[in-house]
C-alpha cells in the first residue's frame, strides 16, 4: 500500500504544526498574504486571486491542465513543484487566519475546486458537501483517473486547516468516504481514490474525534472492521493511525468488489508516497504531464 509509514509521519507533523520549522522560515515572507489580499499576481498565470476566481470557475480543462495555480490558491508550509510560489510561513498563516477577507477568498478557492471535482459546498456553515447538481459525472470520471488531483486534494485539506477553515476538513472527508467506498450507501463511484482517502486525506483532519471516526468507518467499509480500535497492528499501520489498523496486512485483506476491480490500477496510479520522499518523487516524475502539487 505504498509508503504508509511516511504518510502517517507527514500527517502527524502537519497536525502538530511542523515542530521546529519556524526557525527556518523567513519572517519577512509575505507572498501568500499579499496574494490573498488581492495585491499580488500568481505566477506563472499572472492573475489576481479575485480574477482567477471569476474567470476560472467552471473551466475544467484549464484547471486540469494548469500546473502553477494550486500552490497559490492553497499555500501550505511545505515546498511545492512551482518554484514561482512560496511555502506558507507560520507568521503568514497566523496573520491570514485573523482576516475575514482571507477566509472568504479561501472559501471561494475551495468551492472552485469542489466544482471541478463534480462536487459542491451544500452548506458553508456545517461544511456539508454534495454532488454538483448538474454534470457531476464528468468531474468524477476525471478525478477517478487523473491521479495528480489526489495530491491537490491533500494540499487543499492541509490549507483549510492552516488558514482557519479546519471545520471544513471532516465534512468533505465524510462525503468522500461515501463517494469512494460506500456503494451500498449510494456512493462507491471513486474507487481509485481509496488509497489516498485512507492514507493521506483523512489523516490530515485536525479534529481528532472526527478523524478517528472516519478511519473506523473506512476500516469497516474496506475490511469489515474486524480489527478493533487499536493503534495500527500489522501492515495496515501508518495511514490508519488512531483509526485501528486491525493487524491485517495489505496482502491479507479481502477487499470488497468495488476495490477488487481497481486494486491493480490503484497501485499503478498512486501518486502520494508521503510528504517525505515518495510524494516528491512522484511529483518530479509526472511534472511534465500533470503532477502539479506537492
Descriptions of predicted regions:
Residues 125-226, 249-269:
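Alpha-helical bundle/repeat cores within regulatory domains of eukaryotic proteins
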Amino acid at each position: 500500500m505504498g509508503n504508509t509509514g511516511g504518510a502517517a509521519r507527514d500527517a502527524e507533523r502537519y497536525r502538530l504544526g511542523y515542530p521546529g520549522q519556524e526557525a527556518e522560515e523567513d519572517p519577512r515572507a509575505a507572498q501568500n498574504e499579499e496574494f490573498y489580499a488581492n495585491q499580488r499576481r500568481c505566477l506563472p498565470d499572472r492573475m489576481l486571486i479575485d480574477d482567477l476566481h471569476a474567470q476560472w470557475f467552471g473551466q475544467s480543462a484549464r484547471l486540469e491542465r494548469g500546473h502553477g495555480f494550486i500552490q497559490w490558491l492553497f499555500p501550505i508550509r511545505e515546498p511545492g513543484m512551482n518554484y514561482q510560489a512560496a511555502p506558507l510561513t507560520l507568521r503568514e498563516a497566523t496573520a491570514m487566519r485573523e482576516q475575514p477577507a482571507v477566509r472568504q477568498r479561501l472559501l471561494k478557492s475551495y468551492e472552485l475546486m469542489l466544482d471541478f471535482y463534480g462536487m459542491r459546498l451544500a452548506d458553508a456553515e456545517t461544511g456539508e458537501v454534495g454532488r454538483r447538481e448538474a454534470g457531476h459525472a464528468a468531474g468524477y470520471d476525471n478525478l477517478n483517473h487523473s491521479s495528480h488531483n489526489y495530491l491537490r486534494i491533500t494540499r487543499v485539506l492541509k490549507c483549510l486547516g492552516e488558514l482557519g477553515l479546519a471545520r471544513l476538513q471532516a465534512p468533505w472527508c465524510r462525503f468522500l468516504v461515501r463517494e469512494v467506498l460506500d456503494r451500498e450507501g449510494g456512493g462507491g463511484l471513486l474507487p481509485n481514490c481509496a488509497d489516498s482517502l485512507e492514507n493521506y486525506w483523512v489523516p490530515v483532519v485536525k479534529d481528532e474525534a472526527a478523524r478517528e471516526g472516519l478511519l473506523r468507518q473506512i476500516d469497516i467499509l474496506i475490511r469489515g472492521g474486524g480489527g478493533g480500535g487499536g493503534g495500527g497492528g500489522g501492515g495496515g499501520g501508518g495511514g490508519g493511525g488512531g483509526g485501528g489498523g486491525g493487524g491485517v496486512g495489505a496482502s491479507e485483506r479481502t477487499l470488497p468488489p468495488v476495490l477488487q476491480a481497481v486494486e491493480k490500477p490503484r497501485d499503478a496510479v498512486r501518486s502520494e508516497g508521503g510528504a517525505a520522499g515518495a510524494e516528491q518523487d512522484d511529483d518530479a516524475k509526472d511534472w511534465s504531464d500533470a503532477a502539479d502539487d506537492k
